[in-house]
Design a protein with these regions (language model features):
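Conserved hydrolase catalytic core segment
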Residues: 113-155
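Alpha/beta-hydrolase
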Residues: 160-244
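Conserved alpha/beta-hydrolase
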Residues: 69-89
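Active-site glycine-rich loops that stabilize anionic/oxyanionic intermediates
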Residues: 43-46, 53-58, 120, 259
Length: 308
């Protein structure tokens, strides 16, 4: 059976597929033969904002801001990292492999200058692109992000420190992730219950909204389309040094982090805000990890207003 990728002629660098929930889905061929899947929402001729999903996650998550992006004249694009959704796996990848993938993908789509927005596990990738592509990235947004390994461990309670150390060993974390994937496919309502169990009240209220639940499930289904290996590899990647200092980022950065975030404690956001030279941070009282679902209007407006 041929996949969408198999049908691409060798000379083709990008393919636009079927319209999807008021957006489009496509793939871009990279120099090494891999493909990056992506979704595009909003105004096709608008100001480009590149959205990096969380872990696990997929291009689908950008749908949360599709309507507002269209009204605001924003071209919202969401590439998927290797192994997620439509993107080809990249064994042994490093955090700093991503900016070059983004550069090639942006070239194929005719994007010269653009903003980046990383949410949760997408935050480190937004920082990496801001550091490595200062000639392409006009402004960066970082929401509810984790921090580099040393700062991450010091900010976590002891039990979570132990769990964070375990993700370095994919043979330990690997068996649990297929169970999460199966839960998403077969018992989605149960998955929402599991996700909500340890969340603060603000996050539980957000996750109780039917449209948010459906968006989460759609994103997870795409995240696990090829299995759980991409998530296991990414968790291990986050436990290693990033390969650059966030103190060397020269692009303007706007950061948001909920003070009540139990998944990635606010200490991580404070670390990034203190280290990044040109960073304006907002720490949100009573907000948890899912604040982006109610705060995306503020984020889009801030980044659009601040782009150079």
């Amino acid at each position: 059976m041929k996949s969408q990728h198999d049908s691409l002629p060798s000379s083709c660098s990008a393919l636009i597929a079927q319209p999807s929930r008021s957006g489009i889905t496509g793939t871009v061929a990279l120099a090494d033969g891999r493909y990056l899947g992506y979704a595009e929402y909003g105004d096709p001729g608008g100001w480009p904002l590149v959205f990096f999903h969380g872990t696990p996650g997929s291009r689908v998550l950008a749908r949360l801001a599709a309507a507002q992006a269209r009204l605001a004249g924003i071209r919202l694009l969401a590439p998927e990292r290797p192994g997620y959704g439509l993107s080809t796996p990249q064994p042994g990848r490093r955090l700093l492999d991503w900016p070059d993938d983004v550069r090639q993908w942006a070239d194929a789509l005719g994007l010269d200058r653009f903003a980046v927005l990383g949410v949760s596990g997408g935050g480190p990738y937004a920082a990496a692109c801001a550091w490595q592509l200062p000639d392409r990235v006009s402004v960066a947004g970082i929401v509810s992000s984790l921090a580099p390994k040393d700062a991450m461990l010091s900010s976590l309670p002891r039990l979570q420190q132990c769990l964070a150390q375990l993700v370095r060993h994919t043979w330990l974390t690997g068996p649990a992730l297929p169970l999460l994937a199966a839960l998403a496919r077969r018992w989605p309502a149960n998955l929402i219950t599991v996700l909500a169990w340890s969340l603060p009240p603000a996050d539980r209220a957000i996750l109780a909204q039917p449209d948010v639940q459906q968006l989460h499930l759609d994103s997870l289904m795409e995240a696990f389309r090829q299995g759980s290996q991409a998530t296991a590899a990414e968790l291990a990647l986050f436990s290693r040094p990033w390969g650059f200092s966030v103190a060397a980022v020269q692009v303007p950065v706007f950061l948001w982090h909920g003070i009540a975030d139990r998944l990635l404690p606010v200490a991580m956001g404070r670390y990034l805000a203190n280290q990044i030279p040109d960073c304006q941070a907002r720490f949100l009282p009573d907000a948890g990890h899912l604040w982006i679902f109610q705060g995306y209007l503020e984020v889009l407006a801030t980044l659009r207003r601040s782009a150079r």
